Amino acid sequence: ASDFINSDGETVSGPEAIAKAAGVIAATPSSKSIVRTEIPGAAKLPERLKNSQYENAVRNGLLLLSVNSDGKVVFDSGVNTLINPDEEKQDNGWKKIKRAKVRHETFYRLDCEMDKLIGKVNGTKDGIANVIQRGQVVLDTMADEGKLIDPTFKLDTNKGYGADYGYFVVNAVDVDTLERIFIHYKWKYSENS
């Protein structure tokens, strides 16, 4: 279901199809979903899945393609191969490409900001306040970019801080996008029915 036929009529499958998908995923900003993003060079699909096959494929972490209303081959799902998250360490957000990208971007941006502070901030109340302020700025920026909802960067009250260390906790909701829209129609035979 991740295979496609290119504009030359050749079937693109296996590593080549995976590489093409990876390129599109990498080029998509973390604030955007890959769902309904066109696959460059794809002309049509070799097969169409039945609904039960589609649902089973998504549950099993298969990145699916479909043809949109304009006849373009597009990503139809934004799931990855993680199908059974570790319940103690992961939630279902890790199963989604967009959300995993936002989370890894958060790690990277906070790590870069914290690296600037290591060895330069005192292990005092004021130093800890500085770390919290700098971490919160990173998270607020990501919220302004539409990637996080109500993020907080706080001192871990269970572990605290000492002369040369500090433990902090990030709480945030990463923004997802609607991947499916369901419409329920309620028609009436007449105005009086």
Regions found by a protein language model. Give the residues of each.
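Residue-level signal for functionally critical sites in structured catalytic/ligand-binding pockets
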Residues: A1, I97, H104, Y108, ...
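A generic structural signal for short, non-catalytic loop/turn and secondary-structure boundary residues
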Residues: N68, G146-L148, A163
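Extended, compositionally biased non-globular segments
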Residues: E105-D156
